[in-house]
């Protein structure tokens, strides 16, 4: 019984994944990384800002942008 439930849940998840792929809703690892970078908040005093970010002097936090 327990094995049947586990297999059923696995099959449902597998079907949902194929549905997402057919609808073009696949979330690639690159999209996940991009979303995390959007929320990147680093202190300029402690760390240099990564490429593509500048230090906001008022808040002392890195923000997307260029000089």
UniProtKB/Swiss-Prot annotation:
This is Kappa-scoloptoxin(04)-Ssd1b. Residues 1-24 form the signal peptide. Belongs to the scoloptoxin-04 family. It is found in: Secreted. Residues 25-36 form a propeptide. Keywords: Cleavage on pair of basic residues, Disulfide bond, Secreted, Signal, Toxin. GO terms for cellular component: extracellular region. GO terms for molecular function: toxin activity. Disulfide bonds join 44-55, 49-62. It comes from the Eukaryota. Expressed by the venom gland.
């Amino acid at each position: 019984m327990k094995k049947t439930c586990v297999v059923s849940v696995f099959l449902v998840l597998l079907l949902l994944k194929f549905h997402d792929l057919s609808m073009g809703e696949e979330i690639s690892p690159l999209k996940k990384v991009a979303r995390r970078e959007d929320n990147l908040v680093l202190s300029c005093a402690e760390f240099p800002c990564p490429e593509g970010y500048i230090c906001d002097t008022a808040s002392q936090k890195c923000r997307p942008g260029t000089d």
